Structures are given as C-alpha cells and as structure tokens.
Amino acid sequence: FPIFEWPRIDTPKLSFPITDTVLEEVQAKEKHAINQIQLAIQDHPNDIAAIIVEPIQGEGGDNHFRDEFMTSLRQICDENEMMFIMDEVQTGVGITGKWWAHEHFSSRPDIISFGKKSQVCGMLASNRVDEVEHHVFLESSRINSTFGGNLTDMVRFQLILEIITKEKLLE
C-alpha cells in the first residue's frame, strides 16, 4: 500500500449464492463500511477529496457489491462535496457485457479510470470537475502529458472501439 495514511474501508462483498442469511450479513457489512467512511470524513474533514472504488474488485478476489451500497457511496460523495471515482482498469471496455461495469449500478461516477482491456490507460471525467475553477483537465501544466496519451495508442483504441461496435460484441 502507499505510505500515506489513507483511510481504508472494509469490503462489504457479496457471497454467492445470495441467501437470506448472506443478504443479512452483507447488509450489516455495508452498514459497517458506511460507518467507517463517515468516521474517516469526521476525523479528516478537509483531507478526503474522493471515494475510489472498483465496481468489481479484481485484486481483492473478484468481489461484487450491491447497487444499494454503490448508491450509498454516491450519496456520501454528494453530501460531502467529494468525487465518486470508479476504477474500471480491470472491468471496463465491455468485459462485463456493458461498456463499463458501473453501468450495472444505478449510481454514476464523476471520474472513471480505465486501462488494460483498452490497451491504453486514461480517465473520463464528468462536468463535475468544472466545480473546481482551475483543474488539470482545463489548465495546462507540466504534468498534463502524464495522462495525455499518444497518437498511436489513441488510433489503436479507436479501432478497438470500432470493432466492438461493428461486431455488436456488447449486444
């Protein structure tokens, strides 16, 4: 893990098959995770800018979450002026049957990070970033090229997207 003392939240992952008992257990775990988040915000009121979550945790063991949990995360972000970021590096670009895994949930992120399946890495940002007057998507700086990409990768990814669309691979 990074050397920063970032708050880490227990994962309220689903277990399959989903029985009444499993559902009760995961609801209790979700409540615990939400309490951990609220405590972290209370303890660090000016230090937390975002909640970052994988819609399906890959490195954590193929962990799935309920829509209700993602909705709670979105609500916490809205109530605390935080960004809701979905890490789609392992789950994006059609791997779940939709372009993005977060599309299986009712809540939408402010920022999406992606990579691997697209053979390029990057991020998509909603207009919510415009709430910050001077941000890296708007203001030129020496670090912009870090996530700026290159022409070869962009052309390759465009061709990948065209093939997925033409072949109707997500239908």
For the regions a language model picked out, list residue spans one by one:
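Conserved N-terminal phosphate-binding loop of PLP-dependent enzymes in the Aspartate aminotransferase
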Residues: 1-171
